[in-house]
């Protein structure tokens, strides 16, 4: 931005002028003060010199010895100060004169301003003074005026030089401060105002400068922002009618596009749904206008009832609606919402003795930050057109792959929930034994699902699919409750065998985890020390401190805590400090480290040493050979589980094999 007259130059000139006036006055006052001080010092020196010769001069004058008096005057040491010495009689007759320094011209103005030359007059008395002595003569000493003139000029030049430099520094410093504290913020404000796009002029808000919260610039910015807010409110009131659909008062297409522009600017993943209600179109000319309005408003209320507060509902035509589904991150979220919309919209609707069953078509376009508002809208319209041609109550994505992925995701979720409901999930137990004696000390609970052929297994990726479907907390709670139910049944029979249950990070960090777990312990009356929760270390725990806050009350309630799959993730070297803070009792060594035994033992030896230093009980997983068992037993690991001892077993077989005697 260019200006014709710089405020910086003007304020520097003003500051410089003020400073120069100040310097002139100050230099003048100081110069007169210094000259007066020098005059006083010179007069003192002259008086001292005069007193040193007054007595001998008095004796010579009384004796009338003129040569001796002249010799005494000649003996005065001028010291560069005295220019002339005179002996003047009381009748003003000049008896003697002695010049030491030739008189040099001094400007008359300097002589008048500073009262030059400086001279003193000292009375000369007889050696024997009467009661009221009268001087017999006066010794008059005169200072060198030229020397005083040089002092005046030297002092003046020094003062002017120093204070001009100070004035320059002061001018620059003050100007810099004014420039930084006033001009820079004003320039920034001017640049920001000039850079505002035309479409953002109304309602634009200036950022309040950090150092100007409560001064005039801050007041200016606040006043501007307040005026902009008032203008924006007035502008919105004027344009509200033009941005709303008449009957439903929903945002129309113009306002929808503005909202989509904001969504695109934020680059936040969302979905745009176009809902075409064919019933509204088909009733044109059949229902009265008032009836069609009632139908429209009823459908709008139904739509609002299934949308979350974050979502935006708009009406883009007489029978088309649009939903900006904020919060929808995945296609399956969108298809779930679409199914809810279809369900509620297709409910039977009586309109003044006419029974209607509305039907709709829904088109969905996902936004991942790579489209413009127009492209996103066009995709959703295209998907809605395709859905309408497929038949009634159809949902169609613009991208067929998204449709397929969403349907697959919903199918998986439905399959898992159906498996839970139809008792197709079961818990199996794998013994954990003392390696030296083979004695059973505890068992680990493992999840199994019934296969189509009737067998039970844990398919690869099932746990990951459960997590992706958001059902880990549901399935995990089922496993915990089944385990507590089994423990309660055992304990009624006097069997106090501990059970270890895996706990995922999603379960651990769930807000209701502690309350739900304590409720299970109370309901099934689980004895302290018989339930062990295995925190799976390879599943990332985002906040170790929160994990401590969750595990500690459970441990206080009698639940033991084990760290599962040790060495596979969470307790890496840079996280050991967090591991030390966890309230854990047992450390489980992952089978990946056990597989290499006895040949590759360096890592597992370090893990064993760490566990021993923390005084933790150790359990080795995946022990399959006698060589592995022997090495682990020799290294100090007392408990193990693996195919060498037993495979996972159904509860009935486990009880027959291990609990019959008990």
Curated annotation (Swiss-Prot):
The enzyme's E.C. designation: 3.1.4.52
Disulfide bonds: none
Pfam families, per database record: EAL, GAPES3, GGDEF
Alphabetized CDD domains for the sequence: EAL
Stated name of the protein: Probable cyclic di-GMP phosphodiesterase PdeK
Membrane topology value: Multi-pass membrane protein
Keywords for this protein: c-di-GMP, Cell membrane, Hydrolase, Membrane, Transmembrane, Transmembrane helix
Annotated SUPFAM superfamilies: EAL domain-like, Nucleotide cyclase
Domain GGDEF residues, every copy: 268-400
Catalytic activity: 3',3'-c-di-GMP + H2O = 5'-phosphoguanylyl(3'->5')guanosine + H(+)
Entries under InterPro entries matching the protein: Cyclic-di-GMP_PDE-like, EAL_dom, EAL_sf, GAPES3, GGDEF_dom, HAMP_dom, Nucleotide_cyclase, Rev_trsase/Diguanyl_cyclase
Induction: Expressed at 28 degrees Celsius in stationary phase.
Gene3D superfamilies assigned to the protein according to its UniProt record, in alphabetical order: 3.30.70.270, 6.10.340.10, EAL domain (3.20.20.450)
One term of GO molecular function: identical protein binding
EC class: hydrolase
Function statement: Phosphodiesterase (PDE) that catalyzes the hydrolysis of cyclic-di-GMP (c-di-GMP) to 5'-pGpG.
GO BP term, example: regulation of single-species biofilm formation
Keyword Membrane: yes
Residues annotated as domain HAMP: 180-236
Gene designation per UniProt: pdeK
Annotated EAL domain residues: 409-662
Subcellular localization(s) per the UniProt record: Cell membrane
Annotated TM spans: 12-32, 158-178
Record has Transcription regulation as a keyword: no
Signal peptide stretch: none
CC per GO annotation: plasma membrane
Species this protein is from: Escherichia coli (strain K12)
């Amino acid at each position: 931005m260019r200006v014709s007259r710089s405020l910086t130059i003007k304020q520097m000139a003003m500051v410089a002028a003020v400073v120069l006036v100040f310097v002139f006055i100050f230099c003048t006052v100081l110069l007169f003060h210094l000259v007066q001080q020098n005059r006083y010092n010179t007069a003192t020196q002259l008086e001292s010199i005069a007193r040193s010769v007054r007595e001998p001069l008095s004796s010579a004058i009384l004796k009338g010895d003129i040569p001796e008096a002249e010799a005494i005057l000649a003996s005065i040491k001028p010291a560069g100060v005295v220019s002339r010495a005179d002996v003047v009689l009381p009748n003003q007759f000049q008896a003697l004169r002695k010049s030491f320094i030739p008189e040099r011209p001094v400007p008359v103005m300097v002589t008048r301003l500073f009262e030059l030359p400086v001279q003193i007059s000292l009375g000369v008395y007889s050696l024997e003074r009467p009661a009221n002595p009268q001087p017999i003569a006066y010794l008059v000493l005169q200072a060198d005026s030229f020397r005083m003139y040089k002092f005046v000029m030297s002092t003046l030049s020094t003062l002017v030089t120093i204070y001009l430099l100070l004035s320059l520094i002061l001018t620059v410093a003050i100007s810099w401060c004014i420039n930084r504290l006033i001009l820079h913020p004003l320039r920034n404000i001017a640049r920001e105002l000039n850079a505002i796009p035309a479409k953002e002029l109304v309602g634009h808000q200036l950022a309040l400068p950090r150092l100007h919260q409560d001064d005039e610039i801050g007041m200016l910015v606040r006043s501007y922002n307040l005026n902009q807010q008032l203008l924006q409110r007035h502008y919105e009131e004027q344009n509200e009618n033009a941005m709303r659909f008449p009957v439903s008062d929903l945002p129309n297409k113009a306002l929808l596009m503005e909202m989509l522009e904001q969504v695109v600017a934020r680059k936040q993943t969302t979905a745009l749904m176009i809902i075409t209600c064919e019933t509204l179109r088909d009733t044109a000319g059949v229902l009265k206008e008032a009836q069609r309005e009632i139908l429209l408003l009823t459908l709008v209320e139904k739509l609002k009832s299934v949308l979350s507060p974050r979502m935006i509902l708009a009406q883009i035509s007489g029978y088309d609606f649009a939903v900006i589904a904020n919060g929808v991150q995945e296609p399956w979220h969108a298809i779930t919402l679409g199914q809810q919309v279809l369900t509620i919209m297709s409910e039977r609707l009586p309109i003044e003795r006419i029974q209607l069953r509305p039907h709709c078509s829904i088109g969905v376009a996902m936004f991942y930050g790579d489209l413009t508002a127009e492209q996103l809208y066009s995709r959703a319209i295209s998907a809605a057109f395709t859905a309408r041609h497929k038949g009634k109550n159809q949902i169609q994505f613009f991208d067929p792959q998204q449709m397929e992925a969403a349907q697959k995701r919903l199918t998986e979720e439905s399959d898992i929930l159906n498996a839970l409901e139809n008792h197709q999930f079961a818990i199996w137990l794998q013994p954990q034994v003392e390696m030296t004696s083979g004695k059973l000390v505890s068992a680990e609970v493992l999840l199994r699902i019934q296969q189509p052929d009737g067998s039970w297994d844990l398919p690869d990726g099932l746990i990951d699919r459960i997590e992706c479907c958001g059902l880990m907390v549901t399935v995990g709670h089922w496993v915990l409750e089944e385990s507590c139910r089994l423990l309660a049944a055992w304990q009624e029979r006097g069997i106090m065998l501990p059970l270890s249950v895996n706990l995922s990070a999603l379960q651990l960090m769930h807000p209701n985890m502690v309350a739900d777990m304590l409720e299970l312990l109370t309901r099934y009356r689980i004895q302290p020390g018989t339930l062990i929760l295995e925190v799976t270390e390879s599943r990332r725990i985002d906040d170790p401190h929160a994990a401590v806050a969750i595990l500690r009350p459970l441990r206080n309630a009698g639940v033991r805590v084990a760290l599962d799959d040790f060495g596979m993730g969470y307790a890496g070297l840079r996280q050991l400090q967090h591991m030390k803070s966890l309230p854990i009792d047992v450390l489980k060594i992952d089978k990946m480290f056990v597989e290499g035994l006895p040949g590759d033992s360096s890592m597992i030896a370090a893990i064993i040493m760490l566990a021993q230093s923390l005084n933790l009980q150790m359990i080795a997983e995946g022990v399959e050979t006698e060589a592995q068992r022997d090495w682990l037993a020799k290294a100090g690991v007392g408990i193990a589980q693996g195919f060498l001892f037993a495979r996972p077993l159904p509860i009935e077989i486990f009880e027959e094999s291990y609990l019959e005697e008990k």
